Amino acid sequence: MEPITRRTLLAAGGVALSGEAIAAGGKYPRDLTKEDVDRWMKELSNWGKWGPNDQAGTINLITNAKRKAAAALVRDGVCVSMALDADLPKEGSTGGPLPGMGGAPAARGQGGGGASRTTWTLTSRPPGPDSRDLAAYVVDTIAVSYHGNNTTHLDAPSHLYYKGQIYNGYPQSSYSDRGAGKDDVMSMKNGIFTRGVLFDIPKLKGVPYLGDDEAIYVEDLEAWEKKAGFRVEPGDAVLVRTGRWVRVREKGPLDLNRSTPGLYASCVKWLRERGASILGSDVVQDVRPSRVEGVNQPIHQMALHSLGMPLIDNADLEALSEAAAQRRRWAYLLTMNPLRVPGATGGPVNPIAVF
């Protein structure tokens, strides 16, 4: 694959992929190669689609009309969190600073993922014995290393660079010790407010959770659409449940760096066709092993780098699954307010479904 340049894409009219090219073959292969992924990174690219200076990527698909339509989905006023509790050290552990902050963190791990480290620390100063009759404040300091497999977090497009570039052709040199100079989380500083749709794949297959390395294919997504009675529309936030947390409760942690259920690479093409704005899951999106030799996480690679599509990793979708099944409604209002941290390549988040 030759390096993709902004000049090349913009000269082609700002859209790297014609509708005819997307539809070629009308199939979603299950035997992609690294060469296929490199080709799709060009063909499916959104670089230049929203202008040469765009940093929002597929968030552009969440229009004012989309937000109004999403608000109309609220009938019961019931809110459901899709986030895990912060992965704090257990009582009695040594705690300690996070990576890059002066030392190694305490060992732990929530539901597994290779790194058995604590991703959060909280230091609090409790009231002293002489403060009973005083008005006193209790303060704490929270630090978090959120990327990885233990914390519900958002990946901004700048979380991944490939061949010296990030989404929309910005150079790798835009990074510094102050973070990402382009494509950071600030493109979502006004919050996310759109229709969310849940793909409950274990319910589709009649199992409590998927196998440890079970792949989800486009055919599964379309079968769930038919069963649940909705269709992904432009601007939708797509959440995919694998049943990870049920599996963790029953069998113990998964090492997500070695083996995890998740989406097969060809699902990116389908998501691009449908106009999804955000992709999230209770795992880290990609099935592992990826089944694409030489490409460890093709979903991450194509979604972040080529589509400019933010990702929500490690969501807890169990309460959402129950709430949706109870109502037989798998579409809902999704709200999410990322922290406004200039240069951040993402951040811990608490996505909320409102029915």
Task: Go through each PLM region and give its residues.
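N-terminal secretory signal peptides and thylakoid transit peptides that target proteins
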Residues: 1-17
